A protein has these predicted regions:
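Beta/coil-rich, acidic/histidine-enriched accessory regions frequently appended to metallopeptidases
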Residues: 26, 30, 40, 231, ...
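Structural marker of alpha-solenoid helical repeat scaffolds
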Residues: 61, 91, 125, 158, ...
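Helix-start (N-cap) detector for alpha-helical repeat units in TPR-like alpha-solenoids
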Residues: 32, 62-66, 96-97, 130-131, ...
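Canonical tetratricopeptide repeat
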Residues: 67, 101, 135, 168, ...
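Register position in tetratricopeptide repeats
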Residues: 44, 74, 108-109, 141-143, ...
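Residue-level recognition of tetratricopeptide repeat
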Residues: 40, 70, 104, 138, ...
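Long, contiguous interaction/recruitment modules in multidomain scaffold/adaptor proteins
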Residues: 16-30, 44, 175, 408-411, ...
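Juxtacatalytic substrate-recognition/specificity segment
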Residues: 117, 150-151, 192, 220, ...
């Protein structure tokens, strides 16, 4: 069976694997059957043959369905275990433990929805069951979803002897950069494991990861772990996980190679190695590791999907730029249409950030654009984040192409600019920069130097600020990694951007650049703030809060006023009450001029002004909207139309050019822009627009070729011009404009 044939197959419907497929399954629940614990001892010490014999003997000797299911799971016979768990649950509506363990089986295969359903059923049976609550905490921890720390704190306050609770708390604290708290929890887990005679391996893994984060020697903990179980590769896979969390992908691959060397049948580590090599741009290395993972676990969705993604790369063009050195991976169906704009943004961003941050890439920067969002989702598998538009792995950027989302859903040019900033902030600091600062600088650069000018944000960000939900600067990473409320990730992005803006306005850009350089060595935010700004983090937070309060004072004076004002404007527009619509829209703009999306009050105001017959006022409003950061493609096209009506072609040209970085794959705009560029004598830009127009396969190819012929003639390339004229006439032999120009060129060899 090939991986293409099993795509979409649910793992739990697989045939018997009878081999270790996932990382070790440790069950710390005191309700685990003593007979299983005997076999577990052999498994935990790496005595594979003895463990197999023990579990097989249990299957022959017991009729206890739960014990049988656990033994089948331990032997890798997932299908039989799944069937056994199902039978137990179907036989007893109040069977709590079978539900929990069945859910854990789903959790081990990353089928979170099925796992959560079973855990919720268990909680419905007993809302206070610690095993069920711990299971939900593990789901939250693995999915980076919800305030898992609060849940764990409650559980551990009730029962501090929960080994898994201490381990999860250690993981969460470590991911939040709280190394002392993580070490305390991990040490407690180790102590409890010894007291309860359970395997200390996961506790050693956590302690090793903490040592790694502190820059210390992990051998202190990996040594005892391998002495306890010479085949315990998961300790190295755990170290790799935390390196990935820190975006240190090269280091992660080193640990993953150790993991599979120690435990060759740890298929999850082979899989993660393959995924990680792809993050590093090593497609062949990725394929080797993923093929190995597939040989042991042909039903992993991540393995199968990533192998299919690698196969699909034959549908892409890989185009090399020079000066600067860069590679564009663009799908063949849209490569010709997108390349000019991608290349321009890459050149501009690399020149801009190279100067601002004092770094020249030492290897080619690669940008990958995916027209199928599902492919992009596979590309970033295993990373925390919600609704990501792009990701950066060092010198490699992957993102949705403009066709990967609905028109107007995202500004692909700003996304690319944002991600290119990450290339520089990560590289300057050798990936040590905190997530919040790297994201903050990227947002800040969108506002300051990117293709959409202006500081643009939405009311929920300021509402969160007003409610005291902005995090202290020293804790801001937590808002990205483990959000405690639904909007916190987006709020944290904006808070980070506003902090960078505050630094620039308070001390100047050079101080922001020097703050970034505080992380060229291992450092934390609190120490970096003290060193760079000569103030305690609390004092920094106080000044930043005051700056936000001042900048957004009109909105923050009464956060509940803005929405009713917007609703009043919308209602008046619908009633064609232009005066009331204008008044309400102006009030909404004044309250929050930074709100610039497609439903912004600027656009409502412009509609009201145009409805009242004042096109000049509508034009001025739309120009203000664009300056503030507005980029909705329909709004920009409307602005260009008004500018042309007002005989302002230069400004209209700039606006239509801006549309290309929001919505470049619609043909009509390129013809209009091409004509304006020809009129302005901008030959190369006109060549670009008509070339893109032809790549989009317009209905009137004769007119497009004619436009391109005129552009080439203006550029002085007469052979290209004649070639395009002949193309136009081949499509439409009676196309008089092309006939006329060809006659002119035949008689006059000069442009």
């Amino acid at each position: 069976m090939t991986y293409r044939e099993v795509f979409g197959v649910v793992l739990l419907s697989a045939a018997s694997a009878l081999a270790p497929v996932w990382a070790d399954n440790f069950d710390y629940d005191t309700r685990r059957a003593p007979a299983l614990l005997v076999c577990d001892r052999d498994s935990e010490h790496g005595r594979v043959a003895a463990a197999r014999t023990c579990y097989q003997a249990l299957l022959r000797s017991t009729r206890d369905g739960l014990v049988r299911a656990e033994a089948q799971w331990a032997l890798g016979d997932v299908k039989s275990a799944n069937d056994e768990f199902r039978a137990l649950v179907n036989a007893d509506a109040r069977a709590l433990q079978p539900r929990l363990r069945w859910g854990r089986l789903f959790l081990a295969t990353h089928q979170y929805a099925d796992a959560v359903k079973l855990f919720q059923e268990a909680l419905a049976i007993d809302a206070q069951d610690k095993g069920a609550r711990l299971a939900m905490a593990r789901v939250m921890a693995e999915r980076y979803d919800g305030d898992v720390r609060k849940l764990l704190a409650t559980l551990l306050e009730e029962d501090p002897t929960l080994i898994e609770g201490q381990l999860l708390m250690a993981r969460v604290e470590l991911e939040n950069g709280k190394y002392d708290a993580a070490a305390t929890a991990a040490a407690q887990a180790l102590k409890l494991a010894e007291q309860q005679q359970r395997a200390p391996l996961e506790a050693w893994s956590q302690l090793a990861a903490i040592e790694l984060a502190r820059g210390a020697d992990t051998q202190r903990w990996t040594g005892p772990a391998l002495a306890y179980n010479p085949r315990y590769g998961d300790i190295f896979a755990s170290l790799a996980h935390f390196e990935v969390m820190r975006r240190r992908y090269l280091e992660a691959s080193v640990w993953l190679r150790q993991a599979v060397q120690v435990q060759p049948d740890l298929w999850t580590a082979h899989e993660e190695l393959g995924v990680n090599q792809l993050r590093l741009g090593d497609r062949e290395g990725a394929r080797v590791a993923l093929t190995r993972a597939y040989s042991g676990d042909p039903f992993s969705a991540t393995t199968v999907n990533t192998l299919r993604l690698l196969d699909s790369l034959e549908q892409f063009n890989f185009e090399r730029m020079t000066q600067p050195d860069a590679i564009m991976q663009l799908h063949k169906k849209e490569s010709a249409a997108l390349r000019p704009y991608v290349e321009q943004l890459m050149r501009e961003s690399m020149a801009t950030f190279g100067k601002r941050y004092g770094y020249t890439p030492n290897e080619p920067v690669t940008v990958e654009l995916y027209p199928d969002h599902d492919d992009f989702a596979v590309r970033i598998a295993g990373l925390p984040g919600i609704g990501l538009l792009g990701v950066t792995f060092g010198h490699l950027v992957a993102m949705d192409s403009p066709s990967g989302r609905q028109t107007g859903e995202f500004h692909w040019g700003s996304t690319l600019w944002h991600e290119m900033a990450h290339v520089y902030t990560l590289s300057v600091t050798d990936h040590r920069v905190p997530r919040w600062l790297s994201e903050g600088i990227s947002v800040f650069e969108e506002w300051r130097t990117g293709p959409t000018p202006g500081v643009s944000l939405a009311p929920p960000v300021l509402t969160a600020f007003a409610e005291g939900k902005f995090l202290p600067v020293a804790q801001l990473d937590e808002g990205f990694i483990r959000p405690s409320y639904p909007e916190q990730v987006q709020v944290s992005y904006m808070q980070a951007g506003l902090i960078c803006l505050f630094i620039e306005e308070r001390w100047g850009f050079d101080k922001l650049a020097s703050f970034l350089r505080q992380f060229t060595r291992d450092n934390n935010t609190a120490a970096a703030v003290q060193a760079n700004f000569a103030m305690e983090p609390a004092a920094f937070d106080k000044e930043f809060t005051a700056s936000v309060q001042k900048r957004f004072a009109p909105y923050l004076a009464d956060p509940k006023k803005w929405l009713p004002t917007m609703q009043r404007a919308a209602k008046a527009l619908e009633a064609r009450d232009w005066k009331e619509a204008s008044s309400a829209s102006q009030q909404a703009v004044a309250l929050l001029p930074e709100f610039t999306p497609a439903d912004s009050p600027y656009l409502m105001l412009a509609k009201a002004q145009e409805g009242a017959g004042d096109s000049a006022a509508a034009t001025a409003t739309l120009l203000a909207w664009r300056k503030a950061g507005g980029w909705d493609p329909d709004g920009l096209r409307w602005l260009a139309k008004l500018l042309l009506q007002a005989q302002r072609p230069v400004e209209a040209t700039a606006v239509l050019d801006a549309v290309n970085y929001a919505d470049p794959l619609r043909a009509p705009g390129h013809a209009e822009l091409g004509e304006l560029l020809l009129t302005a004598g901008k030959a190369q830009e006109a060549v670009r627009e008509y070339s893109v127009l032809l790549a989009l396969d317009p209905l009137d190819t004769a007119a497009a070729n004619f436009g391109l012929a005129r552009a080439w003639r203006l550029a002085g390339d007469l052979p290209q011009s004649r070639r395009r004229l002949l193309e136009a006439l081949e499509t439409a032999p009676n196309y008089r404009p092309a006939q006329k120009l060809l006659l002119e060129m035949t008689g006059d060899p000069t442009p």
